[in-house]
Regions:
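Hydrophobic-ligand binding "helix-grip"
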Residues: 29, 56-104, 112, 143-147
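A conserved amphipathic terminal alpha-helix motif
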Residues: 106, 113-149
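Hydrophobic pocket/interface hotspot
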Residues: 17-21, 27, 52, 66, ...
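Hydrophobic ligand-binding cavity/cleft-lining segments
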Residues: 1-41
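Amphipathic alpha-helical hairpins
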Residues: 8, 52, 65, 86-87, ...
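A structural signal for short, well-ordered beta-strand segments
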Residues: 6-8, 94, 109-111
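Short, solvent-exposed linear patches
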Residues: 47-48
């Protein structure tokens, strides 16, 4: 199993960041790697089990299922239902935590997956998507960001 994990400090309070992230169907509004997002399952976008289809900015698509969401802990997890990448058993989570006095936040985004083709390109694609997501989130909030790990 391959793992990717990036933690960033974003100069915005946790509640502001969580308000953006928790809207499972709005990723295309802030992630520059996503051109379009629709919820397919007929469930509320912020309910466990809902499925979103992402049309990626560079072409292709991914269908993702929201596995869990905890508004008190400010974290959620999701998995891939279908992807054009040579990736299986994809599970990811995003967690928001207060940093310092609470005016800044730590955002940890991690993914675990198997690659059907052991080409390192797929690890790089997932890494780039997560890093671009961290950067896009900070940009949406007009906040500075530093990746720390």
């Amino acid at each position: 199993m391959t793992s990717v994990k990036y933690t960033a400090i974003i100069d915005a309070d946790p509640q502001t960041i969580w308000h953006v992230l928790r809207q499972f169907d709005s990723i295309a509004e802030w992630h520059t790697g996503v051109a379009h997002c629709t919820v397919e399952s007929g469930k509320s976008a912020d309910t466990g089990g809902s499925i979103r289809k992402l049309t990626l900015a560079e072409g292709g698509f991914v269908r993702q299922r929201l596995l869990s969401i905890d508004n008190d802990l400010m974290e959620f997890s999701y998995g891939h239902e279908e992807s054009e990448l040579c990736i299986t058993d994809f599970l990811a989570s995003i967690k928001v935590r207060p940093e310092g006095d609470g005016s800044r936040s730590t955002v940890t985004w991690q993914a675990h997956f198997d690659m059907t083709n052991q080409d390192a390109t797929y690890h790089s694609i997932v890494s780039a998507f997560i890093i671009k997501g961290q950067q896009s989130l900070a940009s949406k909030l007009m906040a500075s960001m530093t990746i720390i790990a």
